[in-house]
């Protein structure tokens, strides 16, 4: 019986993924800029200080802040943000391409 060739892992030919910390920093910057367009900077500073007091300068704290800001922005848009084009005259409905069922 012939000896089986040793198993080797497949070559990873996909591009190198961005390190997790850099990704979190990028997301934080994007969501911060969006939040500053819609909320009072003093509120955002207070929220950042609160998260920092609970988590310090950690990835868990950054994740918590991202989660809270995403929810706040979602609710803000859902309530009818003046700056949002979604649901506004001339803004177009992004779901209009989907035929009604």
Curated annotation (Swiss-Prot):
PTM sites of type Phosphoserine: 84
Recorded superkingdom: Viruses
Keyword Transcription: yes
One GO cellular component, as annotated: host cell nucleus
Disulphide bridges, residue numbers: none
Signal peptide as annotated in the record: none
Chain's role: Stimulates gene expression driven by the HIV-2 LTR. Prevents infected cells from undergoing mitosis and proliferating, by inducing arrest or delay in the G2 phase of the cell cycle. Cell cycle arrest creates a favorable environment for maximizing viral expression and production.
Record-given protein name: Protein Vpr
Organism of provenance: Human immunodeficiency virus type 2 subtype B (isolate UC1) (HIV-2)
